[in-house]
Amino acid sequence: SYKKPVEIRLLSIKEQYRKTKVFTELLQRTFNYIIQNAYDIVFISGTTRQEKIYNHIGFVKFHENVGTKEAEYMPMYLRLDNGNKVIERLARAQRINFLPGPVDLSEDVIAKLSKQLYSHRSSEFVALTKDTLAKIEGILDVKQATILHGSATLANEAIMAQLKGRNLINGLVLANGEFGNRLVRETKRHGLNIETYSVGFGESFDLDVLSDKLKSGNYDFVYVVHNETSVGILNDLDEITRIVKDNNLVLAVDAVSAVGAIKYSYKDVDYVACSSGKAFCSVAGLAIVGSNCELVPLENTPLYLDLHYANKLTSIPFTQPSILMEALNTALDAFKTDERYEKVQEKYTYMKEGLKQLNLPIMKFKEKEVSSVIITVELPESISSLNVGSSLAINNIFIHYKSSYLQERNIIQFSFININTTKNEIDYTLNILKQMIGD
């Protein structure tokens, strides 16, 4: 049975364009919309003159013809289930990815995902995990790394469990965007006594205010997001770290969207959270915690959150999927040089210049806090972010716009962590934007 039908009406092309790319491109965009909105069956009234084309696509006539002799039409349907080669080809059309996740995967990483699964207790898997941990420790510049099976949220939750286990109960959480606000909610769930230093969406933290707060002696730790993706600000972690350490406090960092996109040494922080997805350009599913302090055993905490337990067992406390570890290990090889970081910066700079030429207002930050990971465009009220995002999607251009915190502010975002995005694709995107909104 079919749960979400759609009818295509009046798909019409002027005669002189019917044997050109216009038909193919119009068909592609129509099916982009249908596929992206999860319709499962399509109905049309097809002209009898084009019956051969409809049959080739896969449409099936289900009723006698309707209309007049001069304009006779066939009621037809197309099932969007597996096995239709035309639909499969349309679905494989080139996608331009400006999302902050999921990310593009290299062919080498994709190949690892097709390997046969093998035991997480095997010598092969233990050696693979040790090698992966060593690579992560080098990239983050931390004393030790621990890998857990879960999303980046698990990495942050495990850090919070460590803070509580060390009786570091009183904390200051810094928030200037959606993910800072999320840290506030998470830390409170762990029973930590939290105060918030919150500034406006995308505003910089006043470091003098931070310093004064920490001098009060009311806190055991500080938690901050390094790259606040929701706005595209790179918080000044150098200065924040200096202030925190001047006050002999513990520093925990959510670096989920920074790691792999921005080269940075986390040697002076206590904990740093990231994941296998995002800018490491592997598949999401492995949570990563880098640490420069001793991990303590947690007797009264769910075992799944116990970093000490996982670290002691070489990050194999429970079942770990071998293909996820294989994929991550391979993806990390791209960081033997700085080329990946340079490409992120290069694409960011190129797109930013193009957006400026379209007179689109880009959210501004202090020079030191500009993030090359993502560009945030604050659209004027006359242009709907929802319309722009959905219209780009029909053209197989995927940007960040659906999150409620973006919609509330009429914001769209372009991320540059995807390895396959080219300058030609950026030019194409800018051209589509120009057609949509004008100069």
PLM features: residue spans?
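A glycine-/small-polar-enriched, mobile loop at the entrance of the PLP active site in fold-type I
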Residues: 94-135, 139-149, 153
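Conserved beta-loop-alpha segment that forms the PLP phosphate-binding cup at the N-terminus of a helix
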Residues: 142-172, 180-184
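Active-site C-terminal subdomain of aminotransferase-like
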Residues: 104-105, 277-353
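Conserved C-terminal alpha-helix-loop-beta "cap" of PLP-dependent enzymes
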Residues: 356, 360-424, 428
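Acyl-donor binding region in acyl/amide transferases
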Residues: 1-72
